[in-house]
Amino acid sequence: MLGKAGSVVWMLCAIWVAADALTVETTQDILRAARGRSVTLPCTYNTYVSDREGFIQWDKLLRSQTERVVTWNFVTKKYIYGNRYENRVRVSNDAELSNASITIDQLTMDDNGTYECSVSLMSDQDVNAKSRVRLLVLVPPSKPDCSIQGEMVIGNNIQLTCHSAEGSPSPQYSWKSYNAQNQQRPLTQPVSGEPLLLKNISTETAGYYICTSSNDVGIESCNITVAPRPPSMNIALYAGIAGGVFVALIIIGVIVYCCCCREKDDKDQDREDARPNRAAYQVPKKEQKEISRGREDEDDHRHEDRWSSGRSTPDQPFQ
């Protein structure tokens, strides 16, 4: 009898403690909201304690640690914000009436993640009351960037790539192909996000390819034109490059030759300039007259000598 009575008392105490315990819950597991908008993370708590002395706290769960979002004190009504959440987060106006929800304004991609709501009361210090909710910030895909990897030469393999820099949730990618007559043709889809591989391309591969990037809140696309060329065009291209290089070498050689010839002419001119310029020297007119007069006197004197010499010679008798 005593043992049964003890069991009943223990059960009654357990029921009383459970009824008096603090509980916290979130009404939704996942919330979605667009970037730049506001979202309310729901959280409610239940307690039979009338004294609201304690605090409400929200944290963001990271891989190896937690990041404080906000702490709100029941008594002082003051906020303690995390580094990224100041002036962006507010607690419900009914915080003292079992509503521990918060509203986050101006959502960014960094707000994606799992959040934990906890309520602590002085009268329920032994109770660890927490609940979690996941926030997914929605961002439409940005216009994808399409590109070709490989040479568009008949017989080659090429890859078509498509990627959006932004998008939450992560965009899904799909491809469509149209021939030169604008007729859609069947295409084996790659795994979303992987390049589209085109093997042994030919004229049948020619046309344009459209990549579509989409998620829950938007859709964007880009297109690529595929025009395979014959291998001979590569030979012509290389020949053109070689011819251009040859012409460039000839031009450089002519320039070097002209420079060398000019340098040689400059040296010869310098050598010529170093010689005295005899033609440039002229005898003054006065001296020219004196020299001319002296020459005339000298000629007259020679003439007289020749004349006198001829007359003074006696005639020889004829034998």
From Swiss-Prot:
SUPFAM superfamilies tied to this protein: Immunoglobulin
Pfam family, one: ig
Topology in membrane: Single-pass type I membrane protein
Cellular location(s): Membrane
GO cellular component, one term: plasma membrane
Segments on the Extracellular side according to the record's topology features: 22-235
Glycosylation sites: N99, N112, N200, N223
Cystine bridges: C43-C117, C146-C222, C162-C211
UniProt PTM comment: Palmitoylated.
Topology, Cytoplasmic side: 257-319
Residue intervals of the Ig-like C2-type domain: 140-227
Extent of Polar residues compositional bias: 309-319
Sequence ranges of Basic and acidic residues compositional bias: 267-276, 284-308
TM region positions: 236-256
Keyword Magnesium set for record: no
Family annotation (SMART domains): IG, IGc2, IGv
KW Membrane (keyword) present: yes
Signal peptide: 1-21
Stretches assigned to the Ig-like V-type domain: 22-134
Region (Disordered): 267-319
Keyword set, alphabetical order: Disulfide bond, Glycoprotein, Immunoglobulin domain, Lipoprotein, Membrane, Palmitate, Signal, Transmembrane, Transmembrane helix
Functional note: May play a role in cell-cell recognition and signaling.
The name this protein goes by in its record: Cell surface A33 antigen
